[in-house]
Each structure stands twice: as C-alpha cells, then as structure tokens.
C-alpha cells in the first residue's frame, strides 16, 4: 500500500514537471512591440520588427537605445517571419501591439490576405492595432536623430490611441481581428493613417479599405476623418475652429449624438442624419461681442452648424463620387431597418451608395463659454 502511494506521488510530480515543456528562454527571444510590412519592388514582403532591448540602469544613464529594428524578406509573410531567426533571435509576438501596413502593399494586395498568417497564429493577439502608413511603413519606425533619447515609435503609436477623447481627428483604434471581420462580411472600412514627419511618428487622417478587393483606394485628411467620426457617432472629443466676421472662434466638443434613419423613396434610399452636439465656446477673438448675450451665442451656434453640414456634405461627396464606397457602415442601417430592400441591393451596394441622397439635421448647443464673456 505504501509502495502504491509513493508511485502515485511520483506520478503527480512528473505531471507537474511536464507543465514546463513549452518554456521559452527569454534571453534567446526578441520581444516585438511593432511590425511594419511593406511590398518591395520585386513583389516580396519586407518585414520590419521593432524589438525591445533589455534596459539596465547603466544603459538608461548612458542613453543607449531602448529598441532595435530587425528586417527580413520573403515571398510569403511566414517565410519572412521565419527568416528573422537566420540572423537574430526568433521573434516572440505575444507582446506585439501594432501592425503597420505600407501604402504600396495596401494598394496592390488584399489586406485580409496579408493578415491571414497573423489571424491564424495563436501566439499573436487579435487585439493588436492595425494602422496604415502614408508611404513606406518601415519609415514610421525610424527616428530623426539617432543620438537623441526618443520614445520608441511603435510605443508612441500605441499611446496615441488613447487620445481620441481629446482629439476627434484620432480614430477609435481598429484591431486586426475586427478588420478581418469587416473584410469577411463584405464591409468597406476606415483605418488610422500614420506618417513619418521629420523623424517622428504622427497620426494623419484615415485610409479607406474598399469592400470586395479589400485594398486601399485612398486617404482622407485628419479634418475629414473627424467629420466622419461625427457622422458615425464615434466622436468623443476635439475642437471645431472657424471664424465669425473674420475673428477666430473655437467650439470644444463635450458630447455628441448621431441618429441615422434611412427611408426608401422611389426605390432609392435616402438617409436622414441627425447630429446633436453640446460643447464649450473655448475661444472667441471677436472684441466687439459679448458671450453673455444669448442672441450672440445663437448666432455662433448657427455658424458652427453650417460649417459641420458643409464639411459633412464635402466628405460624403468624396466617398460617393471619388471612392465610390461606404466605409461608414450606412449599409448596416439599411440591412437592419429595411431587410427586404437590403437583400435586393447588397450585391451592388457601392453603386447604390454612390447615388444615395442625404438630408441633414445638425444642431450645436453652447453650454458654457469659459470664465469670461469678452
């Protein structure tokens, strides 16, 4: 009986030891935080991993870089990933937080197919952010002055995702898992655009991925991106600058609500878009007016309303007639509210969208004007 008990104890001890069968020696791994993917002139993939370097107190004091860029090439994504180990430690992707796709790659190739390996890979998290580079993606991962202590570019891109509550020109972060769902379900969508400006990574508008081809068809400016965030009801903050009789005025967004109601008229959809925004008059350089005056505030509200309506019309016209695609998910409103009509048009929705009419009801409410009236 005692012998049986001893064997039982030994058996369970062996099971516990087996729990470390897949252990990885961290000194033999590269911890990637960002990955830039570009298409080369010979149509191969160029991968640029941005890897963390271990930092001691001495290395921080001496100003040694905290990251290193590791580049590899391959005819397929996986070949390029595996070729990293030829010259550097294998990449450990558990900490990979942002994937940046180059402009040439996205214009020429199906984005969903490019991401196929990363969606299948159980080591990489689907919550990693997806962004579009204006130009080469690898350029965004470089810094201007190599002798200066600067933030890791990929870390900066990650940190900036939290700023959408302060600046409406920053999109709600798009994750690779969500992008794959959009592509698989036949949606066009927007993707945060970034660029290298004088050696620093900077958010700069949005790229448009078109349904069907899943390719990049163009970019929107930062201002146009903010306008579409208003239309989609995703705007969380930011400002709208304009002028009153030549004097600068600025409205700070505190709360905004969007309602979209499609109706079918003569066999065509008409979208009624209502946007109601509350905020603060944070800047008023008109020396001849008084913010304590209700009539003056109403006039300014009307100025902001007309500006937003003008901006919305311009960017929607661009989507309809230049890019001919719906990256703001208006199709969902048709699908949900008019399912029979949707079944007839879903196969050629982009063509229907290009001929769609819009009616706008935009209102601004100034709820505060700061600590001074003039």
Swiss-Prot record:
The keyword ATP-binding does not apply. Residues 1-19 form the signal peptide. It comes from the Bacteria. Pfam families: Spore_GerAC (PF05504), Spore_GerAC_N (PF25198). Coiled coil: none annotated. One of its GO terms (cellular component) is plasma membrane. It is a lipid-anchor. Keywords: Cell membrane, Germination, Lipoprotein, Membrane, Palmitate, Signal. It is found in: Cell membrane. A lipid is attached at residue 20 (N-palmitoyl cysteine). GO terms for biological process: spore germination. A lipid is attached at residue 20 (S-diacylglycerol cysteine). NCBIfam families: spore_ger_x_C (TIGR02887). Belongs to the GerABKC lipoprotein family. Involved in the response to the germinative mixture of L-asparagine, glucose, fructose and potassium ions (AGFK). Cannot stimulate germination in the absence of gerD and gerK gene products (fructose and glucose receptors respectively). This is Spore germination protein B3.
């Amino acid at each position: 009986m005692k012998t049986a008990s001893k064997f039982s104890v030994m058996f369970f001890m062996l099971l516990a030891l087996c729990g470390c069968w897949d252990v990885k020696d961290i000194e033999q791994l590269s911890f990637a935080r960002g990955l830039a993917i570009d298409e080369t002139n010979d149509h191969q993939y160029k991968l640029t991993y941005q890897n963390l370097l271990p930092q001691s107190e001495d290395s921080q004091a001496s100003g040694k870089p905290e990251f290193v860029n590791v580049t590899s090439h391959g005819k397929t994504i996986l070949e390029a990933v595996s070729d990293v180990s030829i010259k550097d430690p294998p990449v450990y992707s558990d900490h990979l937080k942002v994937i940046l796709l180059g402009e040439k790659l996205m214009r020429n190739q199906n984005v969903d197919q490019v991401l196929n390996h990363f969606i299948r890979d159980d080591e990489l998290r689907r919550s990693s952010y997806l962004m579009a580079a204006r130009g080469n993606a690898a350029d965004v991962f470089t810094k201007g002055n190599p002798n200066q202590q600067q933030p890791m570019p990929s870390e900066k891109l990650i940190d900036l995702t939290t700023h959408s509550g302060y600046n409406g020109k920053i999109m709600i972060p798009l994750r690779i898992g969500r992008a794959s769902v959009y592509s698989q379900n036949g949606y066009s969508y927007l993707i945060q655009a970034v660029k290298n400006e004088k050696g620093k990574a900077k958010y700069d508008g949005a790229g448009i991925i078109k349904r069907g081809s899943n390719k990049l068809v163009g970019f929107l400016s930062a201002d146009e991106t903010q306008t579409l965030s208003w239309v989609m009801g995703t705007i969380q903050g930011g400002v709208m600058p304009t002028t009153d009789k030549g004097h600068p005025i600025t409205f700070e967004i505190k709360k905004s609500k969007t309602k979209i109601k499609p109706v079918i008229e003569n066999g065509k959809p008409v979208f009624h878009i209502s946007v109601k925004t509350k905020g603060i008059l944070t800047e008023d350089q008109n020396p001849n007016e008084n913010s304590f005056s209700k009539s003056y505030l109403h006039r300014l509200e009307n100025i902001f309303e007309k500006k937003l309506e003008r901006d919305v019309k311009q960017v929607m016209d661009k989507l309809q007639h230049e890019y001919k695609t719906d990256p703001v998910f208006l199709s969902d409103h048709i699908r949900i509210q008019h399912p029979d009509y949707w079944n007839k048009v879903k196969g050629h929705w982009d063509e229907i969208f290009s001929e769609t009419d819009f009616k706008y009801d935009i209102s601004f409410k100034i709820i505060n004007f700061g600590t001074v009236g003039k």
